UniProtKB/Swiss-Prot annotation:
Family: Belongs to the IolE/MocC family.
Keywords, ordered alphabetically: Cobalt, Lyase, Manganese
GO MF annotations in UniProt: manganese ion binding; myo-inosose-2 dehydratase activity
Enzyme Commission number, as recorded: 4.2.1.44
HAMAP family in the record: IolE
Species, as recorded: Lacticaseibacillus casei (strain BL23) (Lactobacillus casei)
Record pathway: Polyol metabolism; myo-inositol degradation into acetyl-CoA; acetyl-CoA from myo-inositol: step 2/7
The protein's name: Inosose dehydratase
GO terms classed as biological process: inositol catabolic process
Length: 301
């Protein structure tokens, strides 16, 4: 077994939701990072309430010994001129670089239905044309080049309601892109909800996986997502996602595969939930307890 060095962090989306700001609108940035620290996490991703100035954000985080792992970037490579996406990406890159992050989470939002309340995440998800696939692959490689200019990497986030959701779509993107320029984010919750096998994806692309999201899925709500043709956001409100150990996913074989692979990077606990229904601090503690007991994740000092 290879030596594994893992940084364990948690996303702010359980405290306040970027796609639906009304969820957790009363929660302050400082409350969120205080509770992350109290729960024992070492890092976080960037949420919509975080200070936009790197120096200010670093001050708040340093007081709590927290680090920034990454932050989401919405690309529109299939629907807009490349230059528009690149200009926004460079600003995003420079912010994350200033914060000491090594990877940049990128997801294509061209034709995406993930933010539309009236569109079924399954029935209405986009399917790219051959030309759009070419634009996506070429554009991602160019963004990868821009990231490498400052010693960073892009990690592509397969996501419900987008054109890269299924195993076949992930396979196509990985085949069409240079491994040195485009890496992969591995998200357990999105794979399971989509009906994919997370172990298959991890084992197939372990050499390209440079960032991990641990998200669990509630079986009943996942079934309702299909049966009732719900949108992604409606599913979030309905509670389809939860933290590891609270849903249907068996994380033990996934963790064993991660250990065997020698993965070196962040694992981010992530669960889009309504904080009025699922207290984010309690769920952060629940996830940490489960991960500590079940996997005994070795973390860097």
């Amino acid at each position: 077994m290879l030596k594994v060095t893992i940084e364990l962090g948690i996303a702010p989306i359980g405290w306040t939701n970027d796609d639906m700001p009304e969820l957790g609108k009363e929660v302050t940035f400082e409350q969120a990072i205080d509770e992350m620290t109290l729960a024992g996490y070492k890092g976080t991703e960037v949420g919509n309430k975080y200070p936009k100035d790197p120096k200010t954000l670093k001050h708040f985080l340093d007081l709590r010994h927290l680090k920034i792992a990454s932050a989401w970037f919405s690309a529109f490579l299939t629907t807009k001129p490349y230059e528009e996406t690149e200009a926004a990406f460079i600003k995003h890159r420079d912010f994350l670089h200033a914060m000491g992050a090594k990877v940049i989470v990128v997801a294509e939002q061209g034709h995406s239905v993930q933010g539309l309340l009236d569109k079924s995440v399954f029935d209405d998800k986009p399917h790219f044309t051959d030309d759009e696939w070419e634009r996506l692959a070429t554009g991602l490689e160019r963004l990868g080049d821009r990231a490498r200019e400052v010693g960073m990497q892009i990690v592509y986030h397969h996501h419900m309601g987008t054109g890269v959701q299924t195993t076949a779509e992930i396979d196509r993107l990985m085949t069409m892109t240079d491994p040195d320029k485009v890496s992969l984010l591995f998200d357990t919750g999105h794979l399971v909800l989509s009906g994919e096998d997370p172990l298959t994806i991890f084992n197939r692309y372990q050499d390209r996986i440079k960032h991990i999201h641990f998200k669990d899925v509630r079986q009943q709500q996942a079934d309702e997502e299909h049966k009732d043709h719900l949108s992604f956001l409606a599913g979030v409100k309905n509670g389809m996602f939860t933290v590891p150990g609270d849903g249907m996913i068996d994380f033990k074989p996934i963790w064993e595969a991660i250990q065997e692979s020698g993965y070196d990077g962040w694992i981010i606990v992530e669960a889009e939930q309504d904080p009025a229904k699922a207290n984010p601090f309690e769920y952060a503690l629940k996830a940490k307890k489960y991960l500590d007991a079940t996997m005994n994740i070795p973390q860097s000092a």
